[in-house]
Structure formats: C-alpha cells, structure tokens
C-alpha cells in the first residue's frame, strides 16, 4: 500500500463535494487501504477521501475510535441525530490548530461497506464527532467553518507562516 498526500487548507480542492461511489471495485479497495495507511502514517483518527484529493464519498476511522477494527464507510449519510457535544477538534488538513466545534452527541449512519452491503451504525461521543467531521469533508466543509471569520483569518495567517517555515 502507499501513503497519499494530504491536502492542506486553504487548498480549494478541500471545498469540492465528493461524488457517491457507484460500485465497490478493486480500485475502491485500494483507495481505502491507502487511506488507512495514510491515516496511520499521519497519526490521524479519521480521514475523508477528499483530503487526499479523491472526490468520492469514502471515510475511514481509526480502529481505536471505532469498535475493534478500522471503520470504512462508503456514501455515509446521517439518518438520525440528537443531543449535543463539543470537544476540541483537530484536522490533518489544518495542521497545528484545534478548536471546539458543536456536534451531535448521538448519530445513526447509513452507509455501504466494502462488501457492497448497506449498513446502519450508531455512534456517540468521540466516534460520533469523528464521523461527523469526516462527512463534513465529503461536503466541502471544514471544522473551521464553524468558527468566526476572524478566527478563520488568524488560522490562515498561521498556516501561511508554517508553510514558509517548512520550505
């Protein structure tokens, strides 16, 4: 498998809306395996395909935050939601920045698994937050979109400085 390049804000490709996966193919298996390798390499807890410039509705969640194995969700949709929770979130596409974001504490998801079967998954707490965060990516939304414009401008300036330091 291989590690994919993660897009970083303000890359406009992060704002693209992912297309549904029509059929589970060998290429989809390869994409999900590469996404998992990338997530582990970058020490993330979740990753959306759009973060690695693949415009398909695929998310992966680290096994520690899923149940007992990595969670792969294709074409995920939230079909039920309730309660509220807010913890400090970070993102592989927005390095070195964290913020509190309001989320639903409980969600029920409908998605397709790698066998092509429709599944429903209930999640709460950190798993719920992680799934919502990754689904946002599929819709071209970043966690900083929940913040004020002033905070977003500060983040952008900080990331530009960070990028200059790295070069």
From Swiss-Prot:
Cofactor comment: Binds 1 Fe(2+) ion.
Record organism: Buchnera aphidicola subsp. Schizaphis graminum (strain Sg)
Role according to the record: Removes the formyl group from the N-terminal Met of newly synthesized proteins. Requires at least a dipeptide for an efficient rate of reaction. N-terminal L-methionine is a prerequisite for activity but the enzyme has broad specificity at other positions.
Record-given protein name: Peptide deformylase
Highest taxon, organism lineage: Bacteria
Disulfide bond entries: none
Residues that coordinate or bind Fe cation: 91, 133, 137
GO biological process: co-translational protein modification; translation
């Amino acid at each position: 498998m291989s590690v994919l390049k993660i897009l970083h804000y303000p890359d406009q490709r992060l704002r693209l809306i992912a297309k549904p996966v029509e059929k589970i193919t060998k290429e989809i298996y390869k994409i999900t395996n590469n996404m998992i390798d990338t997530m582990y390499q970058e020490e993330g807890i979740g990753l959306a395909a759009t973060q690695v410039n693949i415009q398909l509705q695929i998310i992966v969640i680290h096994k520690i935050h899923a149940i007992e194995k990595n969670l792969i969700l294709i074409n995920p949709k939230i079909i039920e939601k309730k309660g509220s929770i807010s913890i400090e979130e970070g993102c592989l596409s927005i390095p070195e920045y964290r913020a509190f974001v309001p989320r639903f504490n409980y969600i029920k998801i409908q998605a397709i698994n790698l066998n092509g079967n429709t599944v429903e998954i209930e999640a709460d707490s950190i798993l719920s937050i992680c799934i919502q965060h990754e689904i946002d990516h599929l819709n071209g939304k970043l966690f900083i979109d929940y913040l004020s414009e002033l905070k977003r401008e500060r983040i952008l300036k900080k990331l530009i400085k960070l990028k200059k330091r790295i070069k």
